[in-house]
Design a protein with these regions (language model features):
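Non-heme Fe(II)-dependent double-stranded beta-helix
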Residues: 1-75
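Short, solvent-exposed loop/turn segments at secondary-structure junctions
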Residues: 54-56, 71, 90-92, 104-105, ...
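Aromatic-acidic/polar surface patches that form glycan- and anion
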Residues: 23-30, 76, 133-142, 162
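Short, conserved beta-strand element in jelly-roll/cupin
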Residues: 41, 67, 74-92, 140-143, ...
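Non-heme Fe(II)/2-oxoglutarate
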Residues: 3, 146-148, 152-176
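Double-stranded beta-helix
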Residues: 92-158
Length: 176
């Protein structure tokens, strides 16, 4: 990504479409262990809806508000699982993801667009109902570890206060 720092269009394409541009990422999408884990949830017939790389630069205030992915993908009630891989340490200090366990059972809730400058979501979208932060769990991952979550699950992440980037990769699987 350093080589692309002065080429924002190319960097944007890489972050948004790693499965189409990076052979190693395309191989990860088809990893038998990953497919087995996702198949246990969705069944054997899977399709990749999309993928992306998420970079939180070191010592930045960037964050992600509480949200549900399916509210802005146009898939409302899809049977979907996101596999989120840590490509670097994902700790509380580096802004790891936070989940509210069981919140996916609430289905879709109202969201609002804030367009907040430091929010990493495209429109600064956030859940417009109260989220009990005390129920949240931190998803701390080492490089190479992954978490799975449904697009209805309430999730967020804080800023990266460490000296290193926090980098993650997401692969979104759906039933065709």
């Amino acid at each position: 990504a350093h080589e692309l720092a002065d080429k924002p269009d190319k960097l944007s394409m890489l972050l948004s479409y790693p499965g189409q541009l990076l052979p190693s990422f395309a191989k990860l999408i088809r990893n038998p262990k990953l497919i087995d884990a996702v198949s246990q949830i969705l069944g054997p017939d899977l399709m990749v809806w999309g993928s992306g790389l998420f970079v939180k630069e070191a010592k930045t205030e960037s964050y992600v508000t509480w949200h549900q992915d399916l509210t802005y993908w146009g898939l409302d009630d899809a049977e979907e699982v996101t596999a989120w891989f840590a490509l670097s340490n994902s700790s509380v200090a580096s802004g790891c993801m936070r989940f509210v366990p069981g919140s996916q059972k609430k289905r879709l809730v109202p969201h609002q667009d804030t367009f907040a400058d430091d929010n990493l979501l495209s429109r600064g979208q956030e859940i417009a109902v109260e989220v009990d932060d005390s129920e949240a769990v931190n998803v701390i991952l080492q490089p190479g570890q992954a978490s799975l979550h449904h697009g209805h699950l309430f999730h967020a992440s804080g800023p990266n206060t460490t000296e290193d980037r926090r980098i993650g990769a997401a692969i979104r699987y759906i039933k065709p």
